[in-house]
Amino acid sequence: MLLLLARCFLVALASSLLVCPGLACGPGRGFGKRQHPKKLTPLAYKQFIPNVAEKTLGASGRYEGKITRNSERFKELTPNYNPDIIFKDEENTGADRLMTQRCKDKLNALAISVMNQWPGVKLRVTEGWDEDGHHSEESLHYEGRAVDITTSDRDRSKYGMLARLAVEAGFDWVYYESKARIHCSVKAENSVAAKSDGCFPGSATVHLEQGGTKLVKDLSPGDRVLAADDQGRLLYSDFLTFLDRDEGAKKVFYVIETREPRERLLLTAAHLLFVAPHNDSGPTPGPSPLFASRVRPGQRVYVVAERGGDRRLLPAAVHSVTLREEAAGAYAPLTADGTILINRVLASCYAVIEEHSWAHRAFAPFRLAHALLAALAPARTDGGGGGSIPAPQSVAEARGAGPPAGIHWYSQLLYHIGTWLLDSETLHPLGMAVKSS
């Protein structure tokens, strides 16, 4: 009963916090204060994002076979009749309107961005699903997972920005392919890479208050791990639970490496870490939360440095960003302070939304309930026979039972509320693969 009441309280309070997200992003230099608006940079000619081959797991994934009108998979394609999109349809068969649902969703989001960027201009699709064999072998056009696009006015000076808007709309791979068009593609609907959640590999390490390190996968409630407060000061924070835990997961991780000092952090695309401002002098904004998929060489992340016997966080330039597929499991630890040092690099405990402060406030009810249950449950007994009444789940975890596998129910709750209240572009396209509880 106590656990049920706690859950009801959490649902109500979390909903109220998410309805007014603006309360979470005031001015200041603390961690998690993201700058707005975001400046968009056009793609250069022949540039592609992400900087990997199209048919790799880190982009749109492998080719799964050509779809014809007579194949069983033809039902996977859906027509797009969005009036804000112009379809060239040079074949006069309507083929260019056919695409997977994921491709359709991204294309519709891009159409809105185009009209906002250039009033009076619409998105134009020159090629969608192809059934005539006009493309290279294993082209994703044959699966309805790729589109070639321009603007309706065919102004080529706009195409670099059009490509950037496609990236922001959530296409899994965008290529400024030629002076005449932009090529975009998406992952397959059933792809294991379609959702990455926000996690670290089980082989990642954290620093413990009592000294030494521990693998992320071995963390248990009661551990105190190295983290940072909202001013960037190092401290030890209570590990509360895993927001996601999948021991057998095979994930694609972004590998972010620095040279001075030499550190390496692996995390999934939708996870947040903190990037230092370009200029530390003057009244500049504080560190910004950034999706791992958006980190680029030359940006600076925060690492632990030892100077004169003093340990502090210092910005270190990112030397390289690569992709690696690992089968070491995937873990998303939550601390009381919402931050954690993984492999000596500062990261957020949150993912999916690029607003650390919003996420941390949304988890305030969970932290409060966790503290109350931990304080009350150990003292509960049956009063007669001396036997203990079973403790709520969160307290049982603290007694060594360990958190359950999968995505935490509170994370799923916030994600569903977020999809109702927030614009789809606010959420990372590789956000959460919600599992049934």
UniProtKB/Swiss-Prot annotation:
SUPFAM superfamilies xrefs: Hedgehog/DD-peptidase, Hedgehog/intein (Hint) domain
Motif Cardin-Weintraub per record, residues: 33-39
Keyword Lipoprotein tagged: yes
Lipidation residue positions, type N-palmitoyl cysteine: 25
Tissue specificity remark: Expressed in the node, notochord, floor plate, and posterior limb bud mesenchyme.
GO cellular component: axon; cell surface; dendrite; endoplasmic reticulum; endoplasmic reticulum membrane; extracellular matrix; extracellular space; glutamatergic synapse
Cholesterol glycine ester-type lipidated residues: 198
UniProt site positions, description: Cleavage: 198-199
GO biological process: alpha-beta T cell differentiation; anatomical structure formation involved in morphogenesis; androgen metabolic process; angiogenesis; animal organ formation; anterior/posterior pattern specification; apoptotic signaling pathway; artery development
Site (Essential for auto-cleavage): 271
Marked site: Involved in auto-cleavage: 268
Coiled-coil spans in chain: none
Signal peptide: 1-24
A single GO molecular function term of this UniProt record: peptidase activity
InterPro entries attached to this UniProt entry: Hedgehog, Hedgehog_Hint, Hedgehog_sig/DD-Pept_Zn-bd_sf, Hedgehog_Signaling, Hedgehog_signalling_dom, Hint_dom_C, Hint_dom_N, Hint_dom_sf
Enzyme Commission code: 3.1.-.-
Gene3D superfamilies reported in the protein's UniProt record: 3.30.1380.10, Hedgehog/Intein (Hint) domain (2.170.16.10)
Keywords, comma-separated and alphabetical: Autocatalytic cleavage, Calcium, Cell membrane, Developmental protein, Endoplasmic reticulum, Glycoprotein, Golgi apparatus, Hydrolase, Lipoprotein, Membrane, Metal-binding, Palmitate, Protease, Signal, Transferase, Zinc
Top-level taxon: Eukaryota
Entry binding sites for Zn(2+): 141, 148, 183
Glycosylation sites: 279
Known partners and oligomeric status: Interacts with HHATL/GUP1 which negatively regulates HHAT-mediated palmitoylation of the SHH N-terminus. Interacts with BOC and CDON. Interacts with HHIP. Interacts with DISP1 via its cholesterol anchor. Interacts with SCUBE2. Interacts with glypican GPC3.
The name this protein goes by in its record: Sonic hedgehog protein
Encoding gene per record: Shh
